[in-house]
Amino acid sequence: MKITILSVGKLKEKYWKQAIAEYEKRLGPYTKIELIEVPDEKAPENMSDKEIEQVKEKEGQRLLNKIKPQSTVITLEIKGKMLSSEGLAKELQTRMTQGQSDFTFVIGGSNGLHQDVLQRSNYALSFSNMTFPHQMMRVILIEQIYRAFKIMRGEAYHK
């Protein structure tokens, strides 16, 4: 089993990197995890809708170029389906039972994901109707993946 977290932009702050490293270590016994960052598109602060779409398209192509054809793609979207921690564990378990073993979670940049990435998605997942910084979202996501594995194995952690 392999899980990839694919995201736009570079993780900059040391504390986010440390949190990610901790969960990568914790996930070691359960799955191979890889974090891939694609560069975010430099853009002015006040963009037109057309400029926003162009930024999303460029970032989207970078993301799509990193997704393996056989990978099950789970995009993080505000309009996606909200799951509990148990629900995420069940969703992953169901897909693994169906023979899926390569998962790519995709986190877009500050303007969201391009339509081409959304069309490649096998599952749209939402953590909230609120917007989170995409650097923070990586930490939240990797923690929830770890929690899902603990739930699937019936191990103490989730309360």
UniProtKB/Swiss-Prot annotation:
Belongs to the RNA methyltransferase RlmH family. GO terms for cellular component: cytoplasm. InterPro entries: Alpha/beta_knot_MTases (IPR029028), RlmH-like (IPR003742), tRNA_m1G_MTases_N (IPR029026). S-adenosyl-L-methionine binds at L76, G108, F127, S128, N129, M130, T131, F132. It is an enzyme of class 2 (transferase). Specifically methylates the pseudouridine at position 1915 (m3Psi1915) in 23S rRNA. It comes from the Bacteria. Pfam families: SPOUT_MTase (PF02590). This is Ribosomal RNA large subunit methyltransferase H. NCBIfam families: PRK00103.1-3, PRK00103.1-4, tRNA_RlmH_YbeA. The lineage of its organism: Bacteria, Bacillati, Bacillota, Bacilli, Bacillales. Its EC number is 2.1.1.177. Homodimer. SUPFAM superfamilies: alpha/beta knot (SSF75217). HAMAP family: 23SrRNA_methyltr_H. One of its GO terms (molecular function) is rRNA (pseudouridine-N3-)-methyltransferase activity. Keywords: Cytoplasm, Methyltransferase, rRNA processing, S-adenosyl-L-methionine, Transferase. It catalyses: pseudouridine(1915) in 23S rRNA + S-adenosyl-L-methionine = N(3)-methylpseudouridine(1915) in 23S rRNA + S-adenosyl-L-homocysteine + H(+). It is found in: Cytoplasm.
